[in-house]
Amino acid sequence: MATNTPDPDPRDGGDFDYTGGETERPELVAALERRVDGDVRFDDYSKRLYATDASAYEVTPIGVVMPESTADVAAVQEYCFAEGIPVLPRGGGTSLAGQTVNEAVVLDLTDSMDSVLSTDPDAATARVQAGAYVGDLNAAVEPHGLKFAPDPAWRDKSAVGGAIGNNSTGSHSLKYGKTDHYVEEAEVVLADGTVTTFGEVAVDDLRESADADADALLPRIHAEIVRILDEEADEIDERYPEMKRNVSGYNLDRLLAEHRGEYGEAGVVNLARLMAGSEGTLATVTEATVSLVEIPHTKAVALLTYDDLLDAMEDVAPILAHDPAAVEVMDDVLLGLAADTPEFADVVGMLPEGTSSVLLVEFYAEGDADGKQKVADLVADRVGATDDRPRPETESHPSEGAADVTSQPRRAVHAMEAHDAEQRDRFWKMRKSGLPILLSRTTDEKHISFIEDCAIPPEHLPEYTREFQEILEDNGTFATFYAHAGPGVLHIRPLINTKEVDDVEAMVDIADRVTDAVVRLGGSVSGEHGDGHARTQWNRKLYGDELWGSFRDLKTAFDPDWLLNPGNVCGDFDMSENLRFDSEYDYDAGFDPAMEWAIDNGMQGMVELCHGCGGCRGPQETTGGVMCPTYRASEEEIQATRGRANMLRGAISGDLPDDPTGDEFVTEVMDLCVGCKGCKVDCPSGVDMAKLKAEVEHAHHEEHGIDLRTRLLGNFESLAPLGSKLAPLSNLPGKIPGAGLVMEKALGIAKERDLPTFRSETLTDWFEARGGAGVPRDEADREVLLFPDVYTTYTNPGAGKAAVRVLEAANCHVEIPDVDGSGRPPHSKGMLDESRAAARDAVETLAPEVSDGRDVVVVEPTDAVMLQSDYHDLLDGDASDVPDADVTTVSENTYGVMEYVDAHRLDEAIDLDAPTESLTYHGHCHQKATKKDHHAVGVLRRAGYGVDPLDSSCCGMAGSFGYEAEHYSMSKAIGRILFDQVAESDGDAVVAPGASCRTQLKERDAGAPEPPHPVEKLAAALA
């Protein structure tokens, strides 16, 4: 009998200690712990988590502090200033140039200082803490028709403080510019721990402050700012690129422009805007007041196609005359990769043959008619006959006088228009698919971010593109060209193997020569991603010795001992040092993989695949999707896919004390992964942490043996038949008072959980008792093998009976094959030999039947995915002696039950009563990972149900995970996120295809019913 206890706090990660290993500098730890309320973590594993960001760099920090307030930040900086210890403020760790890794005490501002403090819709402003995500800020102000204008690619996972530190922008910078324009005021902590507020201030007041006390830190800062405005104006005018997209160096041009009255009253500057782009080197921003903009009423998109990338580049400047909100480019490499992606294959297929690149042009408009007119004007001006090419037919009608706006040769071959939200989103998703496609490469050669961010005046893009291509060719490599063509920011990531010394030398040569071209063409070394380790060394070449000296003087005024994120912006970083993968990097897993890894570099390629973007850290409310449920429940870096990848790579590369099987902390970290597979589809790189977890657990079992609880849970398919034979006796342990405590003490089964109830009449018993198939084979339209998964067969035969009723109503001949299960339970416990044996038996039984024309249909989603996907890992290649062709035959002809009904439109062949009920649908994470979750929704809607599909993550039960005592708190914390979504839904009832999900949902409230499987609802609607 379950013991009722209060639900855990969603921030509670359970019984896991988030620190481990040796703690260096205990005196420093003790001193900081006395001074702050937040956590102080200087152990090996915590430092490992913060040694990387989304860049190619890796630097082990001194330690990590999770401040809870500005007072905590001030206390840390005051002490470290006195002791000469560097400090690094950090947000989401999404930096692409290495700004957020350093040998310093890291301040993780996203842990506790992450609130949207207030909003003022009338003034269109908001007050936020630095650790608040941009996505959370937008969610708070969206009901008022407002948003934070800069839209960095990872805005749901990027902190506002990080956006300020980087001076972030995004795809729509043509319309909105950079973050500095929207920072009205900032609370900052200076290097010595002084807390002050930066905002608008008269330059004359700065002069008075500087004269009043020349020895104090703040007056010295004021004095240096005044000196720069007085003495460096001409140099700033001469050396700063005349571009909106420049975030290299310090924001002195903005300061000078304000002083001159270009943004308001002359003689007044806003020091908060000097923080923009300073990368935490001048002060730590703890709070900020930011201005907001209205969400555009209407959007319209045109996709222009070109025969050559240079034609597209030539066309950018003329297109800007039409005042677009965004102009984005994709080259032929990315278009080819997108064509191989099912989601975009049809879009690419509609492009004219020979298309080498496309420009996505988006307009903001006052209404549909205005949007269509803007697109029509663009098409009339830019698409047409050049080089004897006939003008394409188009339904667009340009306004009078719109044609030949630019008097430039028309270069676009074809145009596709998108005015409805769905098609616009598809075009944008295709453009944004570029980075995930590039990052999914598992070879040692990777598309490295180091010179991807230069900003060039649009009229010089063709020359820049040609020269860049020549530089790449000289260095024996290539790159893709994509992203923000409108403001002149092409994301170009050369293919480099940083493990090879020659490639690193080529990387430096490319950066050096490209920087020369950038300076000559009047551009910036960084138009978006900042300086950091990758580009700081090129700022001197960009700005010259005099301004470089002024940068250093300003840095010294703010930070006399250079303790705030030292090395960045104007320091001595060398881009070829501190690379995550270098010539000294070593890979030794300590075990051979037990599964097939059909990717380049095998399991090593997967271990090294995470590039650190932080996509796994997105909140459910703003990010959606499945990844990563344990992070969302605990908000701990180590519980994110990125954290686990860092731990695993650290153990394998020797940066942590032991290999994965010998390091108990790493084993525990992997054990807390729920195996949802969300990262396989939601992670831009496609990191398959569930598969890596299975490998690590299997290797651990091989070395240390399998404990009793793991063996019992992993052998559930073998034990369940006995449980049903002994029912109801076998169900007594779940009903006797006090039995839960005994089970927890003896086996580690959470006392709060109700154990599965075994049915004395199994699905197979029922099927045989009714005489087997209800539709004769010779009269059937289809033949189905209903796979007897363990959950449907022994604990929930009702769903299986419903499946039989539905399939037979659609005139299917149904049989239940003689197999003992899919092997999912042992697989989820890392018992891969046992899982492989079950998979082999299933394939050997099913393959001949499928070859004779029968389809395999599975009620339980996780078992369906086992056959469709995981069998390849267990049986393909050298993993087993089962022919790959047999595995493929089974996998390609296996369906989830609702998938099968939808794929063959069986519901349209069934007489259904029109239901009036509305349903809240929670899909199974494994189906979402294989993009098969939509089938049930479509079928139920066609059947007449109203369906609200939740954009939910894992339920938290995750098979046996939620039954394990040490995981109960985490399981319920994950579940609480789902429960809140259910509570907000308007459905009359909840449906869920997963047995574990239904168990978790039943426990959301006292007396809550166990939700049915969707097929049960479909069966209930049978006439």
Residue ranges and their predicted role:
Residues 1-90, 94-481, 490-527, 537-622, ...:
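Noncatalytic alpha-helical scaffold of FAD-dependent oxidoreductases
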Residues 44-45, 102, 354-358, 422, ...:
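Short Gly/Ser/Thr- and Asp/Glu-enriched loop/turn motifs at secondary-structure junctions
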Residues 89-91, 109, 130, 152, ...:
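Active-site proximal loops enriched in glycine and acidic residues that flank catalytic Cys/His/Asp
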Residues 115, 121-126, 298-302, 449-451, ...:
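Short beta-alpha connecting loops at secondary-structure transitions
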Residues 156, 460, 481-488, 503-506, ...:
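Secondary-structure capping and boundary motifs in well-ordered enzyme cores
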Residues 418, 432-481, 505-509, 609-657, ...:
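Non-catalytic terminal/interface segments that mediate subunit docking, oligomerization
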Residues 559, 691, 695-1023:
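Iron-sulfur cluster-binding electron-transfer modules in prokaryotic oxidoreductases
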Residues 582-613, 617-720, 836-842, 888, ...:
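Ferredoxin-type iron-sulfur electron-transfer modules in oxidoreductases and energy-metabolism complexes
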